[in-house]
Amino acid sequence: MTEYLSVSTLTKYLKAKFERDPYLERVYLTGEISNFRRRPNHQYFALKDEGAVIQATMWAGQFRKLDFELEEGMKVLAIGRISIYPPSGSYSINIESLVPDGVGALALKFEQLKKKLAAEGLFDQRWKQNLPQFSKKIAVVTSPSGAVIRDIITTVQRRFPMSQIVLYPTKVQGAGAAEEISGNIRRANERGDFDVMIIGRGGGSIEDLWGFNEEIVVRAIFESRIPIISSVGHETDVTLADFVADSRAATPTAAAELATPNTKIDLINWANEQESRLFNRLTHLIKIRRERLEKLSQSVVFRQPERLYDGHVQKLDRLCERLTVLTENKVANMKHRYELSANRLIPTYSKIVESKKNKTEQLYQSLLLLDISKIKARGFSLITDENGKIIKSVSDVKKGQALDVELTDGQVKVEVK
């Protein structure tokens, strides 16, 4: 009897076959990107050629490793694993690696970034700054070792020795190079006293020169207020730094020549030009001052100098009158306040004196009451023993004891019975 399989059973069987097949565990495909729309995380698109289409999935972690931007219609080389999706019965490739077909990833990234920045206008001629004819201070962003800095120093000293060179030691290739290049460009701008800046390095592969193609470097050059001369690689090497820089030189020597005057004749012409500008400026200033002097000489003040002081004299008189009035008002006000204070203080002072007088009289009378002679005059006597001790109680004496009794008109001796 014929046994019929369910669709699910068949799909599971095929899925197991696919997963166990060593040829399908790692497949190398070439094709054209189709139906690509960038998503926040995982990417879903198709690979096609003239005869077939296969769905493709690329997980977020793998997609972030790409050195170029995927585009619709781009030819690529893909490495991945074939799998079946049971609900739809369709097969697809899970891509692990993806590179452009026929062009290097860096070359493609170069063209994509160049297109993006050009669309923003970063390479437009209208943004280019003119190089100064005579640079007193030159910033150099390059490696501290190697022929580049030596060639620049030699050329500047030969052509315009009065120029000062300030080197910003910079890593020019490898990891972190772009960050150092852009950082030193910004640091030179923060200093603010450079006439021109040279950035560059010697020749090398596209990988060696790539630091000068990074977006952060291009934007740092674009934002620089200092005119920048780019000298990266050999004459045949082209970087994005060359497109955005204010000027490009094929060699470090050529860059130094752009930053300095050509010959002694240029220096003489420049000196003559400065002399002419100074003469014209002084002539113009003298003319303005002469016209102003002539205008002033026709004024009333110069024809009648005494009138120059009329206004000041009148103002001084008004100020003196005002000062006199203010002084009189101030004195009158103080006199009035004094009189008010005196009227309040005199009655108060009289009351205080009278009160103190009464209290003194009371104290005096109290003291009189305590006078011993007054007490004896009222019939009281003072009794003391033989030692002069005052007798205050019966318990202070004993029988037969001799006592002194002091009266108002004399003293008598008595004996206790």
Swiss-Prot record:
Catalytic activity entry: Exonucleolytic cleavage in either 5'- to 3'- or 3'- to 5'-direction to yield nucleoside 5'-phosphates
GO cellular component, one term: exodeoxyribonuclease VII complex
Nuclease listed as a keyword: yes
Top class in the EC scheme: hydrolase
Keyword terms: Cytoplasm, Exonuclease, Hydrolase, Nuclease
Origin superkingdom: Bacteria
Enzyme Commission number, as recorded: 3.1.11.6
Pfam families: Exonuc_VII_L (PF02601), tRNA_anti_2 (PF13742)
Localization of this protein: Cytoplasm
Record has Hydrolase as a keyword: yes
Disulfide partners: none
Molecular-function annotations in GO: exodeoxyribonuclease VII activity; nucleic acid binding
Function: Bidirectionally degrades single-stranded DNA into large acid-insoluble oligonucleotides, which are then degraded further into small acid-soluble oligonucleotides.
Similarity comment text for this entry: Belongs to the XseA family.
PANTHER family according to UniProt: EXODEOXYRIBONUCLEASE 7 LARGE SUBUNIT
Subunit structure: Heterooligomer composed of large and small subunits.
This protein's name: Exodeoxyribonuclease 7 large subunit
Lineage: Bacteria, Bacillati, Bacillota, Bacilli, Lactobacillales
Annotated gene: xseA
